[in-house]
Amino acid sequence: MTIPFQSSTAPTLGVEMELQIIDPATGNLTPRGPELVTFCEEHPEVGLVVKPELVQATIEINTGICKDVAQVERDLTTQLTLLRSVCRERGVSFLSAGTHPFARWRERRYTQTPRYRALVDKHVWTARRMQIYGLHVHVGMPDGDTAIQVINQITQYAPMLLALSANSPFWEGDDTGLDSCRTKVFENLSSAGLPFRFENWEGYENLINVLLETGSIGSQREIWWDIRPHSDFGTIEVRICDATRTLAEVLALTALVQCLAVYFRRLYENGEEIRLLHPGIIRENKWRACRWGLEGELIDPLTLKGVPTRKLIEQTVGEMQSLAAELGCSAYLAAIPAILASGNGATRQRRIYSQSRSLVAVVADLEAGLAT
């Protein structure tokens, strides 16, 4: 079966934020997501679009098709402002982080749609633990072959994105020692993790057809790779990032993803020779980013030497400066040095906990990240 790829000639953007719905009195997750979804469906005049997720304490908001990061900012600012008002009227609140610091997955309720029931029936324990939250960034691609080649390349830089965004050190009240606990929870699903490398779109089609014909997946939506093609949207979708505390971090990561995607697209279109890392090195780098975030080292994709993660990200951001100016996202990319200086979300959560000895205080700080 041929899988058509809807062309997007411009490097358009779309961003999805998975958010935690909490009880302001306790800071714990609350299964009020379906209530918010229903309200928004019944009152389209409000202008807020909220999507359900597997766990009822989760909702997703997203942008439309955006021409640049500035439009992403406008879309998300509008959606977050509307969401604050709707939540306030219902006595709930929301925050953004890769995991909740102390919520227990056994207490979760699940969305009872055929799709989500099938997900839990198939993945059982691994699916029921999915109280995890990510940030997904789409970038438009002109065709499937280009999308595949850009994914092959940007996957080598995905660990840097994870290190910057890592924001899930706690799980059920324990410090896991990881900067991104979400990463390891998510990898347990059957088709999650780093993407496979393909020579072209046909190679991707061949794999998807086998998985469909054997009942391994019901649709392409069940391919949960860290970076995947989205044929219906005509995009690549970068999914490796933890949900970040603030909108400013979302926009900085979006800018970096767009720059990398356009950079590698042009290399491919210009026929330039592209070096591909061994998958084992990419896997090692992903582990290092998951474990140590910005505090460790990554293997440099060019020199194959261990380099401090901060330095490697600084170099990469520096190489993207002229492209960022062309794309109009320089101001957003300029926020990344501040993240490198102050630390990622996991560092901040641990700092708050060290000062307060209270995970409720950590939740309050996370909630404040999107409060205005």
Curated annotation (Swiss-Prot):
Organism of derivation: Gloeobacter violaceus (strain ATCC 29082 / PCC 7421)
Q: Which PANTHER family match?
A: GLUTAMATE--CYSTEINE LIGASE 2-RELATED
Q: Which family, according to the similarity comment?
A: Belongs to the glutamate--cysteine ligase type 2 family. YbdK subfamily.
What is the name listed in the Swiss-Prot or TrEMBL entry for this protein?
Putative glutamate--cysteine ligase 2
Q: Which GO terms describe its molecular function?
A: ATP binding; glutamate-cysteine ligase activity; ligase activity, forming carbon-nitrogen bonds
Q: What class of enzyme is it?
A: ligase
Write down the EC number.
6.3.2.2
HAMAP family referenced in this protein's UniProt entry, alphabetically: Glu_cys_ligase_2
Q: List, alphabetically, the SUPFAM superfamilies matched.
A: Glutamine synthetase/guanido kinase
Pfam families assigned to the protein according to its UniProt record, in alphabetical order: GCS2
Q: Which InterPro entries match?
A: GCL_type2/YbdK_subfam (IPR050141), GCS2 (IPR006336), Gln_synth/guanido_kin_cat_dom (IPR014746), YbdK (IPR011793)
